[in-house]
Each structure stands twice: as structure tokens, then as C-alpha cells.
Amino acid sequence: MKLHHPPADLETTKSSIEGEKRVRVLLAEDDRALRRFLEVVLERAGYEVIPASDGLEAMKLALTNEVDIVITDAMMPNLNGHELCRFLRNSQTLAHVPVILLSALEQKETDLSPEHADAFLAKPVSSETLVECIEKLLGPVSSRQ
């Protein structure tokens, strides 16, 4: 698996230091090494990351934290990514939160139903592709400052 780390963005770093509100990403991934890599990618891109090691933990964190977007692995113990998506879509307070589903299994965007994810990315996902997908769903970091 080839992974690329994005260069740190000076403007993003500067705005983070100045205390501006950053987009909060709930990241649910059971593979510890991949979760840590994705945390670094997202933090370097200017996002605040709330990590979860499985879908059940992610569900609890979504209920107790204000999140702007959820990135979840499709296959996890306790509660998989599809079940997490269904829970979010059926929640009165979380139904509006965009969800990106990550999977090592091939899936077409047309296979995504409304009660599931807003976007699908195949693993391994590059840092550029992940950030582009977030920006497509939420808008670029620079436009939110």
C-alpha cells in the first residue's frame, strides 16, 4: 500500500494557531496504523480529528461531539460502516452530517443509497483524494475561514 503525506499548509497552520474553528472530522477505522495515518493527513490539511476504533465508539462520539463530517471504514467490529451510516441518517440531529465510506472492496458510487454514505472511496486512498472528497462535500478549508 502506497501512502503519501501531504505537505503542511502554512495558511491552515496559521489559522489553526490563531484559534479559528476547524472542521471536526469523526474518523472511524479499526486498523490502528491506517487510522493514525489518516489522522495525520487530516490534521495536516487543517481538520480537527476525533478518532474511533470501531463503529460503536464512533456512534457514541457522534452523539457527544459536534462533528461536521464522518469518515468510516465499511468493515469494522461491533458496528460496521454501513450500520453507522444508517444510524446517522436516522438520527434527528445527525442526519445532515456528510459521510464518506472507505472500503477495500470495490463498490460503485451508484451503489450508494440515500440512507448510506454521501461518497465512497476505495482503499488504499491517497491523501489528496481524501481531502478533495471532503472539500467537495463541505467546501475548501480556505473558504470557511
What are these regions (language model features)?
Residues 29:
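Conserved acidic carboxylate
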Residues 36-44:
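Charged docking surfaces used in two-component/phosphorelay signaling
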